[in-house]
């Protein structure tokens, strides 16, 4: 009744675990509500819907730049879909920021006057995020300090030449334990990703964080370059021991 009153779509009487297993992988799935047409028309609608990361990111990103905090921006945030959440966390940290749309160019970043760049999380397969990947390569080449979260982490890794691949079991939820390899400290973190980076034991990066659930890489720092990534989302602040300190560390000199 509460869902109906709020106009919120819900589902009941369905084995959601079985549904998740069926939909896992590369299957294209459409969810329809209300009055629907013949199945053949629904299938055609799903097939005709663009599913590339560039399309998904552009829909989720801000359409116009906007400022967060007082003063000249110290940080430029590239909004790949979760930019607003990241901007709010940056604001609370006291660092003025300029949030740029996913379509921003390196010239836009340079013109912002910001000394550091954050790549937010967002939707889609990182291998298809060609616009964001091009920007990331320019940022890395210019040696601007940059930190990516979620999709941003994956795109930075690809900009450094690493491959990404689907996880056997996607990470979603607000209770994933992640351990910092150097200190052994464990944070309970928010995850929203279906892909992981294959660092393949490369000497060019240091793996800083790992998942305690499946051992996958959850953070890296590039050796000799001011580039770092976190596969999880400190800005979503899950759990009693959230990971805001990792973002604060990046911002402290901003």
Describe each region flagged by the PLM.
Residues 111, 116-194, 239-250:
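Cysteine-nucleophile active-site neighborhood
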Residues 185-224:
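Catalytic beta-strand/loop cores that center a nucleophilic Ser/Cys/Thr
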Residues 219-254:
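A glycine-centered loop/beta-turn motif at secondary-structure junctions
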Residues 78, 100, 167, 210, ...:
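Hydrophobic residues at beta-strand termini and immediately following loops
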Residues 9, 74, 145-147, 163, ...:
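Proline-centered loop/turn at the N-terminus of a beta-strand
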Residues 70-75, 183-186, 222-227:
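Beta-strand-turn-beta hairpins that frame and shape the catalytic cleft
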Residues 1-95, 100-103, 107, 112, ...:
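RNA-binding accessory domains that recognize and position tRNA/RNA substrates
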